[in-house]
């Protein structure tokens, strides 16, 4: 009996150009459309790969933002309205798609800042929270010091002058107590109701703003890295105030927030929050969301305009950094969308390690 022949499939040339480029979008079809459209006399093979990669990236970016919009509107499916919200609430995408009409996407009303409650009178504090002098002011200070025969190290004096002028322009700003270093603002995002989120590289205890957030436990201990720095900078007075609070309330429940004076800190207030542990992933993110909401609600009761957060949850609470950052940013955005008005105008994320900075910069882009 004759042996059956084995059929060996040919493997050469079986992979498409898209798979070789690591893309889901069809590179061959894009190349064919480029040639058919007569956009140029010669179309290189690499141009189709590059264009397909850009289209794939933009599609993924819009879908992610549209998914966030659908989630915020309590919808389980993405519709054209969510795509419209995603594109128009992102500064770069809005510029890219200027003049583009999204069918069935509806319209996005433009709300003038003066019509937003408390926005007009609080706009003078837009950039007075941090002791970060403008580049031109720093150059002028260095030039003045050089002409006066002083060392260039006198930049701190210009910082003090900048902070004093900012406090003069805004009566609600915290008066400078001591000169501190300038801060580097790495990225920012303005929400649709006017609040601005900043990612900052610096020291939380040297921030000049209305309040700083202290992640703690049920006893409001200063044992953590952030807590130890806050305790050392604030002084013994904060211990007495915390002990007084604990004698009345016995403990700070998980997700709850309490507020004390800043004492020797440049900030007027310290908002203590009992941050949850990442023991159960299903409930930990909800608990962290509620923690952030409680902190912002308490800040609003004190008419706080500027508040600074460290990287909450990613230390002793064992949250993965990207999950903690995503949860915190979404919680802040959802809080401002759920209330009629808020005294908070600026939220700073004061970070010192490069990993946290990279994570917050990446997540801030996707916040709407």
Swiss-Prot record:
Sequence segments annotated as region (Disordered): 154-177
Record GO terms (molecular function): ADP-D-ribose binding; ADP-D-ribose modification-dependent protein binding; DNA binding; protein heterodimerization activity; structural constituent of chromatin
Gene Ontology cellular component terms for the protein in this record: nucleosome; nucleus
Keywords attached to this entry: Chromatin regulator, Chromosome, DNA-binding, Nucleosome core, Nucleus
Compartments, as annotated in UniProt: Nucleus; Chromosome
Subunit structure, interactors included: The nucleosome is a histone octamer containing two molecules each of H2A, H2B, H3 and H4 assembled in one H3-H4 heterotetramer and two H2A-H2B heterodimers.
Record text about domains: The macro domain specifically binds poly-ADP-ribose. Binds poly-ADP-ribose with much higher affinity compared to vertebrate macroH2A1.1 orthologs.
Family to which the UniProt record says this protein belongs: Belongs to the histone H2A family.
Listed name of the protein: Histone macroH2A1.1
Highest classification ranks of the organism: Eukaryota, Filasterea, Capsaspora
């Amino acid at each position: 009996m004759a042996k059956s022949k084995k059929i060996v499939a040919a493997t050469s040339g079986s992979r498409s150009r898209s798979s070789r480029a690591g893309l889901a979008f069809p590179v061959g079809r894009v190349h064919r459309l480029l040639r058919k459209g007569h956009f140029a006399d010669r179309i290189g093979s690499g141009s189709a790969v590059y264009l397909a990669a850009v289209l794939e990236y933009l599609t993924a970016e819009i879908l992610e933002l549209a998914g966030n919009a659908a989630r915020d509107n309590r919808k389980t499916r993405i519709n054209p309205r969510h795509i419209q919200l995603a594109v128009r609430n992102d500064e770069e995408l809005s510029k890219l798609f200027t003049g583009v009409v999204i069918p069935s996407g509806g319209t996005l009303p433009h709300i003038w800042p003066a019509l937003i409650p408390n926005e007009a009178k609080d706009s003078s504090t837009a950039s007075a929270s941090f002791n970060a002098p403008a580049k031109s002011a720093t150059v002028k200070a260095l030039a003045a010091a050089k002409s006066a025969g002083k060392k260039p190290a006198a930049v701190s004096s210009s910082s003090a002058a900048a902070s004093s002028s900012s406090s003069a322009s805004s009566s609600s700003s915290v008066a400078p107590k001591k000169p501190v270093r300038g801060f580097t603002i790495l990225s920012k995002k303005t929400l649709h109701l006017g609040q601005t989120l900043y990612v900052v590289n610096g020291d939380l205890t040297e921030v000049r703003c209305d309040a700083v957030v202290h992640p703690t436990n049920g006893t409001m201990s200063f044992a953590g890295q952030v807590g130890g720095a806050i305790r050392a900078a604030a002084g013994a007075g904060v211990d007495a105030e915390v002990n007084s609070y604990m004698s009345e309330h016995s403990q700070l429940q998980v997700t709850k927030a309490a507020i004390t004076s800043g004492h020797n800190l440049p900030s007027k207030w310290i908002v203590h929050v009992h941050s949850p542990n990442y023991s159960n992933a299903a409930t930990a993110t909800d608990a962290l969301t509620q923690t952030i909401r409680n902190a912002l609600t308490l800040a609003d009761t004190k008419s706080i305009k500027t508040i600074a957060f460290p990287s909450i949850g990613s230390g002793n609470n064992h949250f993965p950094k990207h999950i903690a950052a995503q949860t915190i940013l979404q919680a802040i955005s959802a809080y401002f969308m759920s209330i009629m008005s808020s005294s908070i105008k600026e939220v700073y994320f004061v970070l010192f390690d490069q990993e946290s900075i990279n994570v917050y910069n990446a997540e801030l882009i996707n916040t709407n």
